[in-house]
Amino acid sequence: MASVSRRLLRRETIPCFSHTVRKLFSTVGSPSFAQRLRDLPKDFPSTNAKRDASLLIGKTPLVFLNKVTEGCEAYVAAKQEHFQPTCSIKDRPAIAMIADAEKKKLIIPGKTTLIEPTSGNMGISLAFMAAMKGYRIIMTMPSYTSLERRVTMRSFGAELVLTDPAKGMGGTVKKAYDLLDSTPDAFMCQQFANPANTQIHFDTTGPEIWEDTLGNVDIFVMGIGSGGTVSGVGRYLKSKNPNVKIYGVEPAESNILNGGKPGPHAITGNGVGFKPEILDMDVMESVLEVSSEDAIKMARELALKEGLMVGISSGANTVAAIRLAKMPENKGKLIVTIHASFGERYLSSVLFDELRKEAEEMKPVSVD
Protein backbone atom coordinates (compact mmCIF):
# COMPACT_ATOMS: atom_id res chain seq x y z
CA MET A 1 0.00 0.00 0.00
CA ALA A 2 2.84 2.36 0.85
CA SER A 3 4.44 1.76 -2.56
CA VAL A 4 1.18 2.71 -4.29
CA SER A 5 1.11 5.89 -2.28
CA ARG A 6 4.69 6.75 -3.25
CA ARG A 7 4.02 6.09 -6.96
CA LEU A 8 0.97 8.35 -6.93
CA LEU A 9 2.86 11.11 -5.16
CA ARG A 10 5.65 10.96 -7.80
CA ARG A 11 3.28 11.43 -10.79
CA GLU A 12 4.31 14.71 -12.36
CA THR A 13 1.22 14.87 -14.58
CA ILE A 14 -1.06 15.19 -11.56
CA PRO A 15 0.84 17.38 -9.07
CA CYS A 16 -2.26 18.16 -7.00
CA PHE A 17 -2.65 14.47 -6.15
CA SER A 18 -0.37 14.92 -3.16
CA HIS A 19 -2.97 16.46 -0.84
CA THR A 20 -5.57 13.89 -1.84
CA VAL A 21 -3.26 10.92 -1.43
CA ARG A 22 -1.99 12.10 1.95
CA LYS A 23 -5.59 12.40 3.09
CA LEU A 24 -6.44 8.95 1.73
CA PHE A 25 -3.50 7.08 3.27
CA SER A 26 -3.10 9.04 6.50
CA THR A 27 -3.66 7.09 9.71
CA VAL A 28 -3.73 10.06 12.07
CA GLY A 29 -6.99 9.99 14.05
CA SER A 30 -9.05 9.54 10.91
CA PRO A 31 -11.89 7.25 9.74
CA SER A 32 -11.32 3.87 8.18
CA PHE A 33 -9.64 3.55 4.78
CA ALA A 34 -12.98 2.51 3.25
CA GLN A 35 -14.66 5.65 4.58
CA ARG A 36 -11.82 7.83 3.32
CA LEU A 37 -12.14 6.17 -0.07
CA ARG A 38 -15.87 6.93 -0.15
CA ASP A 39 -15.19 10.56 0.73
CA LEU A 40 -12.41 10.93 -1.83
CA PRO A 41 -14.47 12.14 -4.84
CA LYS A 42 -15.67 15.19 -2.87
CA ASP A 43 -12.10 16.41 -2.54
CA PHE A 44 -10.54 15.09 -5.72
CA PRO A 45 -8.90 18.19 -7.22
CA SER A 46 -8.18 17.17 -10.82
CA THR A 47 -11.54 16.25 -12.33
CA ASN A 48 -14.58 17.96 -13.77
CA ALA A 49 -16.88 15.81 -11.64
CA LYS A 50 -19.48 17.78 -9.69
CA ARG A 51 -19.18 17.75 -5.90
CA ASP A 52 -22.87 16.88 -5.56
CA ALA A 53 -26.07 16.79 -7.63
CA SER A 54 -27.10 20.32 -6.69
CA LEU A 55 -24.31 21.62 -8.94
CA LEU A 56 -26.14 20.15 -11.94
CA ILE A 57 -28.86 22.80 -11.60
CA GLY A 58 -29.08 25.41 -14.36
CA LYS A 59 -27.68 25.91 -17.87
CA THR A 60 -30.62 24.18 -19.55
CA PRO A 61 -30.87 24.19 -23.37
CA LEU A 62 -33.02 26.48 -25.51
CA VAL A 63 -34.69 24.74 -28.48
CA PHE A 64 -36.67 26.13 -31.42
CA LEU A 65 -40.16 24.74 -31.96
CA ASN A 66 -40.69 23.84 -35.61
CA LYS A 67 -43.77 21.81 -36.54
CA VAL A 68 -46.20 23.18 -33.95
CA THR A 69 -45.31 26.71 -35.06
CA GLU A 70 -46.06 26.25 -38.76
CA GLY A 71 -47.89 29.29 -40.07
CA CYS A 72 -46.59 31.58 -37.34
CA GLU A 73 -45.22 35.03 -38.05
CA ALA A 74 -42.60 34.84 -35.28
CA TYR A 75 -39.99 32.35 -34.10
CA VAL A 76 -40.67 30.40 -30.90
CA ALA A 77 -37.99 28.80 -28.72
CA ALA A 78 -38.56 26.90 -25.48
CA LYS A 79 -36.11 26.53 -22.61
CA GLN A 80 -36.07 22.87 -21.58
CA GLU A 81 -36.12 22.92 -17.78
CA HIS A 82 -36.82 19.19 -17.61
CA PHE A 83 -33.04 18.81 -18.01
CA GLN A 84 -32.68 19.76 -14.33
CA PRO A 85 -31.73 17.06 -11.77
CA THR A 86 -35.36 16.48 -10.74
CA CYS A 87 -36.73 17.29 -14.19
CA SER A 88 -38.34 20.64 -13.40
CA ILE A 89 -37.60 24.35 -13.15
CA LYS A 90 -38.33 24.27 -9.41
CA ASP A 91 -34.81 23.01 -8.70
CA ARG A 92 -33.66 26.61 -9.13
CA PRO A 93 -35.79 28.25 -6.39
CA ALA A 94 -35.46 25.19 -4.14
CA ILE A 95 -31.68 25.47 -3.90
CA ALA A 96 -31.90 29.26 -3.66
CA MET A 97 -34.41 29.34 -0.80
CA ILE A 98 -32.59 26.70 1.24
CA ALA A 99 -29.20 28.36 0.68
CA ASP A 100 -30.67 31.73 1.68
CA ALA A 101 -32.19 30.31 4.87
CA GLU A 102 -28.94 28.56 5.78
CA LYS A 103 -26.95 31.73 5.18
CA LYS A 104 -29.29 33.60 7.55
CA LYS A 105 -28.95 30.72 10.07
CA LEU A 106 -32.70 30.13 10.02
CA ILE A 107 -32.33 26.39 9.40
CA ILE A 108 -29.88 23.69 10.51
CA PRO A 109 -29.52 20.25 8.86
CA GLY A 110 -30.53 17.44 11.19
CA LYS A 111 -32.49 19.80 13.44
CA THR A 112 -34.92 21.85 11.34
CA THR A 113 -38.09 20.39 9.82
CA LEU A 114 -38.94 21.98 6.47
CA ILE A 115 -42.66 22.41 5.73
CA GLU A 116 -43.97 23.60 2.37
CA PRO A 117 -47.27 23.74 0.45
CA THR A 118 -46.81 22.54 -3.13
CA SER A 119 -48.65 21.36 -6.21
CA GLY A 120 -45.85 18.89 -6.79
CA ASN A 121 -42.74 20.10 -8.57
CA MET A 122 -41.51 22.47 -5.86
CA GLY A 123 -42.10 19.70 -3.36
CA ILE A 124 -39.96 17.30 -5.37
CA SER A 125 -37.16 19.85 -5.69
CA LEU A 126 -37.22 20.70 -1.99
CA ALA A 127 -37.32 17.00 -1.08
CA PHE A 128 -34.29 16.46 -3.33
CA MET A 129 -32.38 19.23 -1.54
CA ALA A 130 -33.54 18.05 1.91
CA ALA A 131 -32.30 14.53 1.20
CA MET A 132 -28.85 15.78 0.23
CA LYS A 133 -28.54 18.16 3.16
CA GLY A 134 -30.16 16.08 5.90
CA TYR A 135 -33.45 17.86 6.63
CA ARG A 136 -36.74 16.30 7.61
CA ILE A 137 -39.39 17.66 5.22
CA ILE A 138 -43.20 17.65 5.24
CA MET A 139 -45.24 18.60 2.17
CA THR A 140 -48.88 19.62 1.99
CA MET A 141 -50.43 19.23 -1.45
CA PRO A 142 -53.86 18.99 -3.13
CA SER A 143 -54.98 15.39 -3.53
CA TYR A 144 -55.35 15.87 -7.30
CA THR A 145 -51.58 15.94 -7.80
CA SER A 146 -50.31 12.99 -9.81
CA LEU A 147 -49.24 9.69 -8.29
CA GLU A 148 -45.81 10.07 -9.89
CA ARG A 149 -45.20 13.28 -7.96
CA ARG A 150 -46.20 11.70 -4.68
CA VAL A 151 -43.99 8.65 -5.23
CA THR A 152 -41.06 10.82 -6.30
CA MET A 153 -41.29 12.96 -3.17
CA ARG A 154 -41.54 9.88 -0.99
CA SER A 155 -38.46 8.43 -2.69
CA PHE A 156 -36.50 11.41 -1.36
CA GLY A 157 -37.88 10.74 2.13
CA ALA A 158 -40.52 13.48 2.23
CA GLU A 159 -43.65 13.12 4.37
CA LEU A 160 -46.89 14.01 2.53
CA VAL A 161 -50.16 15.50 3.75
CA LEU A 162 -52.91 15.63 1.10
CA THR A 163 -55.59 18.34 1.22
CA ASP A 164 -59.11 18.77 -0.16
CA PRO A 165 -58.84 19.53 -3.90
CA ALA A 166 -61.98 21.67 -3.77
CA LYS A 167 -60.11 24.16 -1.58
CA GLY A 168 -57.26 24.44 -4.07
CA MET A 169 -53.84 25.74 -3.12
CA GLY A 170 -55.44 28.05 -0.56
CA GLY A 171 -56.40 25.02 1.53
CA THR A 172 -52.98 23.48 0.98
CA VAL A 173 -51.26 26.64 2.21
CA LYS A 174 -53.50 26.85 5.29
CA LYS A 175 -52.68 23.26 6.27
CA ALA A 176 -48.97 23.97 5.88
CA TYR A 177 -49.23 26.91 8.29
CA ASP A 178 -51.15 24.75 10.76
CA LEU A 179 -48.29 22.23 10.69
CA LEU A 180 -45.74 25.03 10.99
CA ASP A 181 -47.38 26.18 14.23
CA SER A 182 -47.55 22.67 15.70
CA THR A 183 -44.12 21.32 14.70
CA PRO A 184 -41.02 22.11 16.81
CA ASP A 185 -38.06 23.70 15.00
CA ALA A 186 -40.08 24.03 11.79
CA PHE A 187 -39.40 26.38 8.90
CA MET A 188 -41.35 27.22 5.75
CA CYS A 189 -39.53 28.40 2.63
CA GLN A 190 -42.73 30.18 1.52
CA GLN A 191 -42.21 29.96 -2.22
CA PHE A 192 -45.14 32.33 -2.82
CA ALA A 193 -43.57 35.10 -0.71
CA ASN A 194 -39.83 34.39 -0.68
CA PRO A 195 -37.74 36.95 -2.62
CA ALA A 196 -35.06 34.28 -3.16
CA ASN A 197 -37.54 32.55 -5.49
CA THR A 198 -37.60 35.58 -7.78
CA GLN A 199 -33.92 36.41 -7.36
CA ILE A 200 -32.65 33.04 -8.60
CA HIS A 201 -34.47 33.56 -11.90
CA PHE A 202 -33.03 37.08 -12.15
CA ASP A 203 -29.57 35.66 -11.47
CA THR A 204 -29.68 32.49 -13.61
CA THR A 205 -32.71 31.83 -15.82
CA GLY A 206 -32.88 35.34 -17.25
CA PRO A 207 -29.16 35.58 -18.07
CA GLU A 208 -29.21 32.12 -19.65
CA ILE A 209 -32.05 33.17 -21.97
CA TRP A 210 -30.27 36.42 -22.83
CA GLU A 211 -27.01 34.61 -23.58
CA ASP A 212 -28.58 31.80 -25.61
CA THR A 213 -30.53 34.27 -27.77
CA LEU A 214 -27.47 36.55 -28.08
CA GLY A 215 -29.66 39.32 -26.72
CA ASN A 216 -32.21 38.93 -29.52
CA VAL A 217 -35.20 37.87 -27.43
CA ASP A 218 -38.22 40.10 -28.08
CA ILE A 219 -40.95 38.44 -26.03
CA PHE A 220 -40.94 36.16 -22.98
CA VAL A 221 -44.01 34.09 -22.04
CA MET A 222 -44.39 32.14 -18.79
CA GLY A 223 -47.13 30.50 -16.78
CA ILE A 224 -47.77 31.86 -13.31
CA GLY A 225 -47.63 29.61 -10.26
CA SER A 226 -45.65 31.27 -7.50
CA GLY A 227 -44.78 34.03 -9.97
CA GLY A 228 -41.05 33.73 -9.33
CA THR A 229 -40.04 32.83 -12.87
CA VAL A 230 -42.01 35.42 -14.82
CA SER A 231 -41.06 38.15 -12.31
CA GLY A 232 -37.35 37.33 -12.08
CA VAL A 233 -36.80 36.63 -15.78
CA GLY A 234 -38.99 39.58 -16.73
CA ARG A 235 -37.02 42.01 -14.59
CA TYR A 236 -33.70 40.73 -15.89
CA LEU A 237 -34.65 40.87 -19.57
CA LYS A 238 -36.08 44.36 -19.18
CA SER A 239 -32.89 45.46 -17.41
CA LYS A 240 -31.01 44.41 -20.55
CA ASN A 241 -33.57 45.74 -23.02
CA PRO A 242 -36.60 47.75 -21.83
CA ASN A 243 -38.39 46.94 -25.09
CA VAL A 244 -38.65 43.21 -24.32
CA LYS A 245 -42.29 42.34 -23.69
CA ILE A 246 -43.26 39.97 -20.87
CA TYR A 247 -46.50 37.97 -20.77
CA GLY A 248 -47.87 35.78 -18.01
CA VAL A 249 -50.16 32.78 -18.50
CA GLU A 250 -52.98 31.54 -16.27
CA PRO A 251 -55.71 28.88 -16.64
CA ALA A 252 -58.89 30.20 -18.26
CA GLU A 253 -60.85 28.24 -15.66
CA SER A 254 -59.12 30.03 -12.77
CA ASN A 255 -58.38 33.48 -14.15
CA ILE A 256 -58.11 35.51 -10.96
CA LEU A 257 -55.30 37.70 -12.31
CA ASN A 258 -57.71 38.88 -14.99
CA GLY A 259 -60.46 39.58 -12.48
CA GLY A 260 -62.10 36.15 -12.55
CA LYS A 261 -62.70 33.61 -9.82
CA PRO A 262 -60.57 30.63 -8.75
CA GLY A 263 -61.75 27.30 -10.08
CA PRO A 264 -60.66 23.74 -10.80
CA HIS A 265 -58.35 23.21 -13.76
CA ALA A 266 -55.80 20.70 -15.07
CA ILE A 267 -52.78 22.97 -15.54
CA THR A 268 -50.89 21.72 -12.51
CA GLY A 269 -48.45 24.26 -11.10
CA ASN A 270 -50.23 27.29 -12.55
CA GLY A 271 -53.32 29.15 -11.41
CA VAL A 272 -52.91 28.78 -7.65
CA GLY A 273 -56.17 30.62 -6.93
CA PHE A 274 -54.66 33.75 -5.38
CA LYS A 275 -52.14 36.46 -6.29
CA PRO A 276 -48.74 35.42 -4.91
CA GLU A 277 -46.88 38.04 -2.93
CA ILE A 278 -43.75 37.87 -5.09
CA LEU A 279 -45.61 38.20 -8.40
CA ASP A 280 -44.65 41.44 -10.16
CA MET A 281 -47.70 42.44 -12.19
CA ASP A 282 -45.98 45.61 -13.39
CA VAL A 283 -43.32 43.71 -15.34
CA MET A 284 -45.96 42.11 -17.60
CA GLU A 285 -47.85 43.48 -20.58
CA SER A 286 -50.77 41.24 -19.70
CA VAL A 287 -51.71 37.77 -18.47
CA LEU A 288 -52.93 35.46 -21.24
CA GLU A 289 -55.59 32.84 -20.55
CA VAL A 290 -55.24 29.25 -21.77
CA SER A 291 -57.80 26.51 -21.21
CA SER A 292 -56.85 23.16 -19.70
CA GLU A 293 -58.12 21.45 -22.85
CA ASP A 294 -55.83 23.48 -25.11
CA ALA A 295 -52.85 23.00 -22.78
CA ILE A 296 -53.30 19.22 -22.71
CA LYS A 297 -53.73 19.04 -26.47
CA MET A 298 -50.55 21.04 -27.04
CA ALA A 299 -48.53 18.98 -24.55
CA ARG A 300 -49.50 15.87 -26.52
CA GLU A 301 -48.60 17.55 -29.82
CA LEU A 302 -45.19 18.58 -28.51
CA ALA A 303 -44.35 14.93 -27.88
CA LEU A 304 -45.66 13.73 -31.24
CA LYS A 305 -44.37 16.56 -33.42
CA GLU A 306 -41.31 17.96 -31.64
CA GLY A 307 -40.12 14.95 -29.65
CA LEU A 308 -40.53 16.96 -26.45
CA MET A 309 -42.38 15.04 -23.72
CA VAL A 310 -43.38 17.82 -21.35
CA GLY A 311 -46.03 18.59 -18.76
CA ILE A 312 -49.37 20.34 -19.05
CA SER A 313 -48.11 23.77 -17.95
CA SER A 314 -45.51 23.55 -20.72
CA GLY A 315 -48.37 22.96 -23.13
CA ALA A 316 -50.10 26.07 -21.79
CA ASN A 317 -46.95 28.16 -22.19
CA THR A 318 -46.58 26.96 -25.77
CA VAL A 319 -50.21 27.72 -26.63
CA ALA A 320 -49.73 31.28 -25.37
CA ALA A 321 -46.42 31.69 -27.22
CA ILE A 322 -47.93 30.47 -30.50
CA ARG A 323 -50.90 32.79 -30.05
CA LEU A 324 -48.48 35.72 -29.86
CA ALA A 325 -46.38 34.31 -32.72
CA LYS A 326 -49.40 34.39 -35.05
CA MET A 327 -49.94 38.12 -34.57
CA PRO A 328 -48.81 40.16 -37.62
CA GLU A 329 -47.19 42.79 -35.39
CA ASN A 330 -44.79 40.13 -34.08
CA LYS A 331 -43.56 39.05 -37.51
CA GLY A 332 -39.87 38.11 -37.43
CA LYS A 333 -39.60 38.44 -33.67
CA LEU A 334 -38.14 35.86 -31.28
CA ILE A 335 -40.50 34.59 -28.60
CA VAL A 336 -39.09 32.54 -25.72
CA THR A 337 -41.10 30.40 -23.35
CA ILE A 338 -40.28 27.64 -20.88
CA HIS A 339 -41.03 23.94 -20.77
CA ALA A 340 -41.06 23.66 -17.02
CA SER A 341 -41.22 19.91 -16.36
CA PHE A 342 -40.89 16.44 -17.88
CA GLY A 343 -44.02 14.70 -19.15
CA GLU A 344 -43.22 11.38 -17.51
CA ARG A 345 -44.25 12.97 -14.21
CA TYR A 346 -47.85 13.10 -15.51
CA LEU A 347 -48.36 9.49 -16.60
CA SER A 348 -51.27 8.98 -14.20
CA SER A 349 -52.87 12.34 -15.06
CA VAL A 350 -55.43 13.33 -17.67
CA LEU A 351 -52.56 14.09 -20.05
CA PHE A 352 -52.08 10.39 -20.74
CA ASP A 353 -55.59 9.01 -20.15
CA GLU A 354 -55.98 7.47 -23.60
CA LEU A 355 -52.44 6.12 -23.89
CA ARG A 356 -52.55 4.71 -20.38
CA LYS A 357 -55.79 2.87 -21.11
CA GLU A 358 -54.36 1.61 -24.40
CA ALA A 359 -51.22 0.34 -22.66
CA GLU A 360 -53.23 -1.37 -19.92
CA GLU A 361 -55.34 -3.22 -22.50
CA MET A 362 -52.41 -4.47 -24.58
CA LYS A 363 -52.26 -8.24 -24.99
CA PRO A 364 -49.11 -10.31 -25.50
CA VAL A 365 -48.60 -11.86 -28.93
CA SER A 366 -47.70 -15.49 -29.42
CA VAL A 367 -44.08 -16.29 -30.20
CA ASP A 368 -43.27 -19.44 -32.19
Curated annotation (Swiss-Prot):
The keyword Lyase applies. PROSITE patterns: CYS_SYNTHASE. Pyridoxal 5'-phosphate binds at residues 121, 225-229, 313. Pfam families: PALP. Keywords: Amino-acid biosynthesis, Cysteine biosynthesis, Lyase, Mitochondrion, Pyridoxal phosphate, Transferase, Transit peptide. Transmembrane segments: none annotated. Its cofactor is pyridoxal 5'-phosphate. One of its GO terms (biological process) is root hair cell development. Its main location: mitochondrion. It catalyses: O-acetyl-L-serine + hydrogen sulfide = L-cysteine + acetate; hydrogen cyanide + L-cysteine = 3-cyano-L-alanine + hydrogen sulfide + H(+). Residues 1-31 form a transit peptide. One of its GO terms (cellular component) is mitochondrion. Its EC number is 2.5.1.47, 4.4.1.9. Mainly expressed in mature rosette leaves. Also detected in roots, young rosette leaves, stems, cauline leaves, and flowers. It is found in: Mitochondrion. GO terms for molecular function: copper ion binding; cysteine synthase activity; L-3-cyanoalanine synthase activity. The modification N6-(pyridoxal phosphate)lysine is found at residue 90. The keyword Manganese does not apply. Acts as a major beta-cyanoalanine synthase. The cyanoalanine synthesis reaction is more efficient than the cysteine synthase activity. Probably unable to interact with SAT and to form the decameric Cys synthase complex (CSC) and is therefore not an enzymatically true OASTL protein. Probably involved in the detoxification of cyanide that arises from ethylene biosynthesis. Maintains a low level of cyanide for proper root hair development. Belongs to the cysteine synthase/cystathionine beta-synthase family. This is Bifunctional L-3-cyanoalanine synthase/cysteine synthase C1, mitochondrial. The gene is CYSC1.
